[in-house]
Design a protein with these regions (language model features):
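Accessory nucleic-acid engagement/destabilization modules that flank
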Residues: 2-17, 22-233
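N-terminal pre-P-loop "Q-motif" helix
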Residues: 22-25, 240-261
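Short glycine/proline- and acidic residue-enriched helix-loop micro-motifs
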Residues: 236-237
């Protein structure tokens, strides 16, 4: 008889459900993230982020977390490293700007956002070094080194035999500190984290999304409320003048973008 293939899990069983496979979780999060991303014109990037955000759970150390034999394991950063590899961001001169945003969103979906310049060297070392353990979270990476990543890639391929990396918008140079890229990262991050949370909550309560959905947005009414709120903040803010100037610029840029088709 052939060797039995291992099943990798994303969540252990509780009083609401049995153990949930990583395949099921990734598929559901990718689907919901695409739905959220479509609302901001980032359907593909959000779907890609959702589809690999827990790649790092294809790992003995993370499976040990579920069984109680391990703790302090970071699966998010190895997931980001795999997406970084899939997008070939280490070799391209003019990178997929949305790809970088997706990597940043995946890396931060549990412990907070980190910019690509701050983590790129670590991602590359994690992919190649069996000894790398310098996660910003202070935890042990669920995967490190070529052998562990290769085993995880084989398990992922068994779960998703038709997977292929989608083209994520057109190539353009990414300028350090550009507001548009910063906002793109945060919007993708929001899509991913919301999808991840909603899927997990729906595992416990299948009616979660229906219960927590809101009526269609009345954009004009909400914009008026936002303008009143922001006007009050400008009058009463005690923050540094330069910080407020940056906030006003972000607000103005968002307004300008909102006027575009």
């Amino acid at each position: 008889m052939g060797k039995k293939l291992r099943t990798y899990y994303a969540k252990s069983a509780n009083s609401f459900h049995g153990a949930i496979t990583n395949r099921e979780h990734l598929d559901k999060v990718a689907t919901l993230a695409r739905r959220f991303g479509a609302e901001i014109g980032k359907e593909k990037a959000a779907g890609v982020a959702g589809g690999v955000h827990d790649f790092g759970k294809y790992a003995d150390r993370f499976q040990g977390v579920l069984s109680g034999t391990h703790q302090g394991v970071d699966h998010a950063l190895p997931s980001a490293a795999e997406l970084y590899r899939l997008l070939d961001l280490r070799t391209t001169q003019r990178v997929w700007a949305d790809g970088i945003c997706a990597v940043e969103a995946v890396a931060g979906h549990h412990d907070g956002l980190i910019g690509m310049p701050q983590m790129q060297d670590g991602l590359e070392e994690m992919l190649s070094s069996d000894d790398w353990d310098d996660c910003p979270s202070g935890k042990m990476p669920s995967l490190h080194g070529q052998e562990e990543f290769m085993q995880a890639e084989e398990a992922f391929a068994r779960d998703f035999p038709d997977f292929h990396m989608q083209r994520i918008q057109g190539k353009r140079s990414r300028v350090q500190g550009r507001l548009e890229d910063m906002l793109d990262t945060r919007m993708l991050f929001s899509c991913l984290v919301a999808a991840d949370y909603c899927v997990s909550a729906s595992d416990d309560d299948p009616a979660y999304l229906e219960k927590n959905s809101r009526p269609p947005l009345d954009a004009e009414a909400m914009l008026k409320k936002l303008e009143v709120h922001c006007a009050h903040l400008r009058k009463t803010s005690t923050a540094d003048v330069s910080v407020n100037a940056l906030r006003n610029e972000v607000y103005a840029r968002c307004g300008e973008a909102g006027e575009q088709p």
